[in-house]
Amino acid sequence: MARSLAALLLLLVAAAGASHAASPAEMYWKIALPTSPMPGAIRDLISPASSAASASKDKEDTVGSVFFLEKDLFPGSKMTLHFTRATAGAALLPRGRADSVPFASEKLPEILSQLSIPAGSPTADAMRSTLAVCEAARIASETAPKHKHYCATSLESMVELVASSLGTRDVHAVSTEVVNRAGPTPRQAYRVEAVRPVPVPGGDMVACHRMPYAYAVFGVHGIKGAAYTVTLAGADGTMAEAVAACHGDVDGHGVAVAEAYKRLGVAPGKVAVCHFLPQDDMLWVRN
């Protein structure tokens, strides 16, 4: 399988040279997921100039921090949301390059040296935190297989983790997109214009969350529940096609979700709690 993929990649490289310069990520996607459209979260990493919206330093001021109940998601409902992006400039590395850079806390000085990042800088501190989270998640996944959570440092490793979790490569991904505004969007009221269920066979999904790092790193974990694509109209005319994930498996998904259950007045595991995915995150499901 690996040899056939390599051969196909060489053919695509030759074809790209005759027409346009396709990126390694685009070529890999065409081979690995030929029938699945590339989500905006990946497209924007390939063309970072198109994702120059500002990032929020406050996790409580992002679209992903707003939790609600499934019954409250209907045309005409209103929510105050803030669509933000991860720090600009984080590249999506090809697997070969990503694998050549260590990814371990004990190797952080070497990592910073390879990537020319000053020790003690905000970026270095964020990387230290992400490495610690990824290492803790890996250990927890080994002791509690029900809540597997891994970190992917390349598109190839992400797709393999997703395929392993869902039991097939016949998958596709969806992500949130602000469709008519390239720059930063303010925190404002949005009206729900339309709600469309995402087909989720067996209720099995895999979420991929961008993590703060010098290059694109995703936290990958499985969830069980429902998903929707939601058309949102902002007070200033901003339009968004947002992905909402609704799930009740609060265990292993952090304090924020547990706090959401308290605010919404429901018991953990009894009722699904929903949240929108930030633009940098993705949700994968079987076709």
From Swiss-Prot:
Keyword Isomerase listed: no
BURP domain: residues covered: 67-287
Domain of life: Eukaryota
Coiled coil: none
Disulphide connectivity of cysteines: none
Residues spanning the signal sequence: 1-21
UniProt keyword annotation of Mitochondrion present: no
Tissue: Expressed in shoot.
Keywords, comma-separated and alphabetical: Signal
Listed name of the protein: BURP domain-containing protein 2
Gene that specifies this protein: BURP2
